Amino acid sequence: MSEPTRMQMLAQVLEQNPSDAFARYGLAMEHARMGQNDSALNEFSKLLQMHPDYTNGYFMAAQTLVKVDRNEEAKKMLENGIAAAKRTGNRHALSEMSGMLDELS
């Protein structure tokens, strides 16, 4: 029997605990890595609905949106992420997302 893939392992974790932010983010990133952008965006959406202060989710969702030429949605995602970064005091995320928003504007 073959070893389970990262995606399969993350899906198993989420079956047991659907609100696991780390596993949800990891699954979204695996989809993005494989070019499955719609699936990635779906997972990022679930993540951010359950964990609105998970700042990396906003940044990576925005990058995925840019990949599929949805720049206006990416800007809105970054604005929401910047608000989350301010709420949580995450200066690094604030800087990254502000820089990306400036590039898109």
Please place each PLM-identified region on the residue numbering.
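Canonical positions in the second alpha-helix
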Residues: 12-13, 46-47, 81
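Structural marker of alpha-solenoid helical repeat scaffolds
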Residues: 16, 50, 84-88
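Residue at a conserved register position within TPR or TPR-like alpha-solenoid repeats
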Residues: 31, 65, 98-101, 105
